[in-house]
Amino acid sequence: MDVLSDMLQNPILSEYEHQREKNVILEELAMTYDQPDAYADMLIDQTLWPNQPMGRDVGGTKDSVISISKNSLADYHNRQYGPENSVIAIAGNIAHSVAINETEKLFGNWGKASPLDWHRVQLPESNAPRVTIGNRRTDQAHLALAMNGVSSTDPRKYSMSLLNTILGEGMSSRLFMEMREKRGLAYDVASHASHYKDCGALTAYCGVDPSKIDETLVVLQNELGKISIDASEEELSNAQAFATGRLYLRLEDTRAVMSWLGGQELLFNEVKTPEKVVDEVRSVTIGDIRSVAREFLDPRFYKLAIVGPYRSQGRFKKLLAA
């Protein structure tokens, strides 16, 4: 804690270190742009949340990184890093009184901050299907098909998470079984649900032979369409067991417990116990699953990002409208 408090309250932020770290980040960005799957992830965020921070890569762009001066970085640190904008979470073999005393000793004189205003996500006026193409000469086409989801405070969050588990999480998921095991279209195929402070998304991803991109997109949409009709009690039960088992397994790690406590306190001003979360996961019904599937897995609202040897959006817009 002594080292961490010194880093937070008294960072050196030298010009030399500033320039060196900028070079490191520029190399990280170059690596991301060179990885088609990572680039597809970047493009789908831009497609879901265009022209706003939520849709931009957290690493920035080459131009934005180069433009950051040492003084602007120091100003950002002074505004954002302070007790009003921080949570100190401690997990492990330590008495509560000792943790409080150490925190007061090391952070008691931490100067006040003036955190930047938070701006809510603005969804586009038109929620019609959108397609973004990243033209690359690749041996494999990478596609991400997404739709807006629910936020981390939405009571349907657990329904959406379990829907995602049934759809594309793990080797027994629908997408894995249909697209890899049955049809042999893809090696890497999965879906994931994201829940942020005021928005969310559900995204399906796969990498396929460029000549099979049309077939893949048709099969993928068929799977998304079926789940609101035939999601089963057995699938839900398996997804609930998977989710609760994974939660308890993760919390065997002390660092994960620390993140569990700190993250909830910082974002929600409350900390749910694991038991409370498990109860909420187990309370989800098959009706809840089908309901969120009908509402959010609607082809009228699909967003598609593709990285591969393509230029025209037209053929893919037609496939989304089919």
Regions found by a protein language model. Name each.
Residues 1-116, 122-124, 133-134, 138, ...:
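Charge-rich, well-structured scaffold segments of protease-associated domains
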Residues 129-130:
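Flexible, small-/acidic-enriched active-site or ligand-binding loops
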Residues 145:
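A domain-level signal for the structural core that forms small-molecule/cofactor-binding pockets
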Residues 157-171, 175:
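A conserved active-site cap/scaffold subdomain adjacent to cofactor or substrate pockets
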Residues 174-182:
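Short amphipathic alpha-helix segments
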